[in-house]
Structures are given as structure tokens and as C-alpha cells.
Amino acid sequence: SASLVGSEMCIRDRLKGSADVFLYPGHVNAITGTALCESLTEEGVSGVVAGFTAKELLTALAVSLKRYQEGKPFFVNCYPRVVTAEGSKEAQRLVDELMESCDSEWRGLGVIPDSGMKLRKEWEMFDARVKYQIPEMEGRANPACRCGDVLQGKCKPSDCKVFGKVCTPKHPVGACMVSNEGACSAYFMYGV
């Protein structure tokens, strides 16, 4: 998918030197498959596909640490009960038929070319933004929030001035605190 390629390449370029291993989300790879992630090892990018339970995440982290210590780029699918090499062909077919890639703004990362998806022209009648002429909303990030730096591995959640004070799971300031899958939320809940 162009969306995955665009975002993956941009993030990889921005993270050069600051991320040793990517932890790929299982729900995305369940659709896209693992081919792109596997091919990135040829460019020196290591990664592991993980599930979402504590056991699945810990397994992915343990595999990452072990393989990283071997000193060679690697890819491992630690979520094989859901993620396959080819992904979901039917989901891919539907995405290709109905959607096209577009530039998209990522909180804390800025605009990443071809990292979003929108309905193709022939399906715009189902796009509420087009149908009801809803203007683009511009989000304003709290300048004290370091979510972008957390996402890029430049700091820990606890390094952020608003973490645990203004920004909590009940009152999130940045995307990293919004869901229980976010790095800041996990730090907050488990004291990592």
C-alpha cells in the first residue's frame, strides 16, 4: 500500500540513528502483509511485528533484544496467528478499489507524503467531508507536549513537562496518551 510505504520511508529517514528496531503494529500488517517490512532489512532497518496482549508485546520485545544483539538487520513476525506474509488480499483489493493515498498530517511528525488514505473520486459521495462541505480542521498541538519526540524515540514520556500533570489518560494532551496502546499512556499506567 502506498500509504504504508510513504509513512514508513519518511519515519525511517527521520529516525536514522535514533531507533534500533521498529515495533510494527499487528493490525496494520494483518492487512498489508509483511513484505515491505521484510524488504527494509536490506536497507539496514530492523523490525518485529507484535500483537497487543502483554504476552505478545513482551515476546516481541524479547525477540527484538535478542536479535539486535546479533548485530545484523532483521525482521521477525511475532504475531503469526494473525499476520501473514501476504496479508489480507480481500482487504487490499477493497482498499485499492475504494481508496487512494494522500498527504497526511501526523501529530508531532508533520505532513508525510502519501501516508494517508482518502476515498477515490468515484466514491466521494460517501465522504462526509465532501458531501457536507466540512472544512479541513487544523489541530493545534500544545507546544509543551513532546508526543512527536516520544514517537521518534528522542525522549521518554517522563521527559515531557506536561506528562502526568496536565496530560493524563483522563485528560490527554497528545496522541501518545489518548489510547491505552500509546507510549505515554503505558508509562503513566505501568510506571515503565
Tell me what each language-model feature is.
Residues 1-6, 11:
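Single conserved hydrophobic/aromatic residue that forms the stacking wall/gate
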Residues 11, 32, 36, 43, ...:
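General structural feature for long, well-ordered alpha-helical segments within catalytic domains
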Residues 59-149:
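Internal helical hairpin/lid segments
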